[in-house]
Amino acid sequence: MKGLSEGLILGIESSCDETAAAVVAGGRRVLSNTVASQVDLFRKYGGVVPEIASRRHLELILPVIREALQMAGVTLEQIDAVAVTHGPGLVGTLLVGLSAAKALAFGLDKPLIGVNHLQGHIYANFLVEPPPEFPLVCLVVSGGHTDLIYMAGHGRMELLGRTLDDAAGEAFDKVARSVGLGYPGGPQVEKLARSGDPEAVPLPRAHTEGPYDFSFSGLKTAVLQYVQRTGPLNDQQRADLAASFQRAVTSVLVERTVKAAEAKGVRQVILAGGVAANGALREEMRAALEPRGIRLGYPPPVLCTDNAAMIAAAGYYLWRAGVRHDLDLNAVPGLGLGIGG
């Protein structure tokens, strides 16, 4: 079953509150994708507690890796390389996955490949059919990042714009808390917004100096002020506010992405990151792109949230390009999307 020419990559992900391992063949075929989520654990806290998350990763990392290998029907000896998230993320949780990956790479004499978590989200798009076609514009939108990227090919990236303050996903979480919704906030806001009027509450859209940059702090503040000014909200007011907020976010994301796609002359746009699972964003983006003859791609929701299949996919293309990392590879909590890789 091995197929040496395919390249079997074991991916490991532990950047936040998901302990994940996966085996991917040839950067495209998911043989297994095991995720142990801590969402239920942190729901009572309203967010991730780093120390608790790290301890839970320690308990889960080896069983999750074993399960991924068993589900894939492969042994450690058949793996060609070990790919692991080394940033960005929480330093304590990153170290758990990184330490496990180093131990495996050293013990098996296999290449170690450090993967940028954000690149992992991008490469989740290469695990679906049809795969994206270069050149393309990618919108990475998650709890910690909102980036607009031009990709001419594998490893050939240009950062076009990013958020100047809050990430879109962070704004979703904070607004969710302000209207009494649970954690994680994004899916809760999206669900509530379905029964609301997106035009009911006038909310600002930030204008940034950079044509492809984003800013959501003013929008978040406007929502908080509306809640304080209005007082206790009834169910319909909460739904209207959720819908109006969601529309304010998605309209800006769509407008900047379309502008970038037209400026770069691409025929392909892809979405990546947790917020890429948002149905309203997908629908509005598709409605804006299709009349322009631009294709829209995105992963299924299970590959939008943190997982190790995306890390293995990104790791495959790095492995194929000859990238190898030493065992002194560090966890980098604030790792950015490096231009060109």
From Swiss-Prot:
Positions that bind substrate: V140, V141, S142, G143, G144, D173, G186, N278
Cofactor(s) recorded in Swiss-Prot or TrEMBL: Fe(2+)
Single GO cellular component term: cytoplasm
Superkingdom assignment: Bacteria
Record's subcellular location: Cytoplasm
Binding site for Fe cation: H117, H121, D306
Main location as per UniProt: cytoplasm
Enzyme Commission number(s) from the entry: 2.3.1.234
UniProt keyword list: Acyltransferase, Cytoplasm, Iron, Metal-binding, Transferase, tRNA processing
Cofactor binding remark: Binds 1 Fe(2+) ion per subunit.
Claim: Acetylation is one of the keywords in the record: no
GO biological process: tRNA threonylcarbamoyladenosine modification
Gene Ontology MF term list: iron ion binding; N(6)-L-threonylcarbamoyladenine synthase activity
Reactions it catalyzes: L-threonylcarbamoyladenylate + adenosine(37) in tRNA = N(6)-L-threonylcarbamoyladenosine(37) in tRNA + AMP + H(+)
Role noted for this protein: Required for the formation of a threonylcarbamoyl group on adenosine at position 37 (t(6)A37) in tRNAs that read codons beginning with adenine. Is involved in the transfer of the threonylcarbamoyl moiety of threonylcarbamoyl-AMP (TC-AMP) to the N6 group of A37, together with TsaE and TsaB. TsaD likely plays a direct catalytic role in this reaction.
HAMAP family to which the protein is assigned, alphabetical: TsaD
PANTHER family, per the entry: TRNA N6-ADENOSINE THREONYLCARBAMOYLTRANSFERASE (PTHR11735), TRNA N6-ADENOSINE THREONYLCARBAMOYLTRANSFERASE, MITOCHONDRIAL (PTHR11735:SF6)
UniProt record similarity statement: Belongs to the KAE1 / TsaD family.
Name assigned to this protein: tRNA N6-adenosine threonylcarbamoyltransferase
Provenance organism: Symbiobacterium thermophilum (strain DSM 24528 / JCM 14929 / IAM 14863 / T)
Organismal lineage: Bacteria, Bacillati, Bacillota, Clostridia, Eubacteriales
